[in-house]
Amino acid sequence: MNKDYQKFWSSPSDPVHFEVDTSHEKVESMSESDTMNVSNLSQGVMLSHSPICMETTGTTCDLPQNEIKNFERENEYESTLCEDAYGTLDNLLNDNNIENYSTNALIQPVDTISISSLRQFETVCKFHWVEAFDDEMTEKPEFQSQVYNYAKDNNIKQDSFKEENPMETSVSANTDQLGNEYFRQPPPRSPPLIHCSGEMLKFTEKSLAKSIAKESALNPSQPPSFLCKTAVPSKEIQNYGEIPEMSVSYEKEVTAEGVERPEIVSTWSSAGISWRSEACRENCEMPDWEQSAESLQPVQEDMALNEVLQKLKHTNRKQEVRIQELQCSNLYLEKRVKELQMKITKQQVFIDVINKLKENVEELIEDKYKIILEKNDTKKTLQNLEEVLANTQKHLQESRNDKEMLQLQFKKIKANYVCLQERYMTEMQQKNKSVSQYLEMDKTLSKKEEEVERLQQLKKELEKATASALDLLKREKEAQEQEFLSLQEEFQKLEKENLEERQKLKSRLEKLLTQVRNLQFMSENERTKNIKLQQQINEVKNENAKLKQQVARSEEQNYVPKFETAQLKDQLEEVLKSDITKDTKTTHSNLLPDCSPCEERLNPADIKRASQLASKMHSLLALMVGLLTCQDIINSDAEHFKESEKVSDIMLQKLKSLHLKKKTLDKEVIDCDSDEAKSIRDVPTLLGAKLDKYHSLNEELDFLVTSYEEIIECADQRLAISHSQIAHLEERNKHLEDLIRKPREKARKPRSKSLENHPKSMTMMPALFKENRNDLD
């Protein structure tokens, strides 16, 4: 990185080199003497801009000694004021009571201790100062525009002044050229850079102006032109000649790291350039003041006075312009001072924070040392743990090898155990099956023995029964033959009776059919009557409607009471009911005489059925009468006709059911006769077949008993074999358990020793042993 340096001297006689890195990377702390030298230089620069300083350069010849002394006192007073101002600014940085700033600003002297304490934190706060200045320049475009407009106005005034006085403006052109370069640039967004020319800046001390004033007071006989041309004595010229050796070279760009005083830096640079230009002009115009004093003449003195007067006029004009500029700059500087005061108050807060941070840093340092001690302890413990880990790893490797060997043995034993267990399970299943079969065989054998005993008893009983049955059969044959003959006679009689009954039933059916036909004819007649009655009813309704209309009219004409109308209605209803009962009686009398000749010929069962039908008919007719009384005449006639049709249908259905019952009875009688005859003939054959079946069953039972006995013997043999196998398997299981216990005991002994030596490193091993035990179990 390229670095820009600024070099300052406190005076031409004793140069003190101080370098300030203006780059954004490093800022070197300043000592107390360097800060005082910079403040002295800045005071001289500020005095060069004042109108008093401008007057002293050209008008020292006309001033008396008293005025010169007063002028020097004023300069000294102003310098002390500037020093006090800078001292107050430095004191404000460490002042905790911000409210006492107004009292301390004019009274408190320069506090070098506070400056040195602040210099310690200059490197820390550099980044914050740069950021604050960047924020001010970026956040305040009005400030940038004011600076830019002020530079424009200044340039315009200078151009107009140059047009009026081209001779004298050439001298001051060099002085203002470098000072105005900063203002001619447009307001940038980034922090502004102070551009200076690459020439050597030459500074002189306040002693130059003082020496000029003293010599002018000591030599009043010399003319004013002599004072103007020879304003510097030989000693000062010699000192002035030594300045290039102590000159400071500026780079072209100086970053604005001194954020607190950017305007002072710019004015200081322009003032330094004006000092240099005036000194160069005086060096050019004054070759040797002793030789010029001898060669001058009074005519030349007059010419010089005129020139001096003209120059004074022009300088007065310049001073007026300069005063205006300085007034503007003073206003701006006042604003800037207020802003800086606010910044200083903020910086005081930052200083408190920094003090707190110091305390925190000290605490952190103490904690750091404690942590270092703890770290050393932990290192020692880690070394011990590493040694323990190495030993434990060795033991673990040994235990792993043992574990692998044991696992292999365990797998082999487990495989053998699984095979033996499978065999044991299969043999146990076979044993259970054989035991269950044996029990079932015992049960079946006991049952078969019981059945055999029963069959033998039955055989004896059957033999006795067959003998007695043969005797009985012989007797029964004789009796049955006699009964058969008697039954044949009775059967013939029954056939004759059945034929007679059939003929009677046929005649009854014919009569019933005729009655049904008569009923159908009567129903058709009743339908025609009902149709006629409906027509009559419609006519009666129409007449009733007409009569009602007439009655309503007559009621309107002649008022009739309501109870008389109610009596008339009741009389009409009674008349209608009497007519309906007469019609129902006539229909009932017409139906009953037709059925009377049939009842004489029927059996008592038929008479009962006919009486039931008659009662049902009576009940139906009674219901019909009740319905007719409740309903209108039209509905009653239609329902009466429908119910009569239903009654006829019911009668036909009952007749059909009677015929079907008769047929079923005839079939049953014939079947019974045939079955009885067959049973009497086939009894001996059936008994012989049953005896043959019993004999075959006995033979089968004997064969099964023998086969079951053989099966039981085989099962007993198998049980004996299975018992022997079970005993052998139990012995093997005991042997396997002994083999499994031995490696466990061997593994426990070395593990217990290792656990006693290194208890911490073997904390995870019991879990592994538990898992292995669970697997074994």
UniProtKB/Swiss-Prot annotation:
Protein name per Swiss-Prot or TrEMBL: Cancer-associated gene 1 protein
Taxonomic lineage of the native organism: Eukaryota, Metazoa, Chordata, Craniata, Vertebrata
Basic residues: bias regions: 743-752
Record PANTHER family: CANCER-ASSOCIATED GENE 1 PROTEIN
Coiled coil (UniProt feature): 303-560
InterPro entries the UniProt entry points to: CAGE1_homolog, CAGE1_N
Organ and tissue specificity: Testis-specific expression in normal tissues, but wide expression among cancer tissues and cell lines.
Disordered as annotated region, ranges: 737-777
Pfam families hit by this protein: CAGE1
Keywords assigned by UniProt, alphabetized: Coiled coil
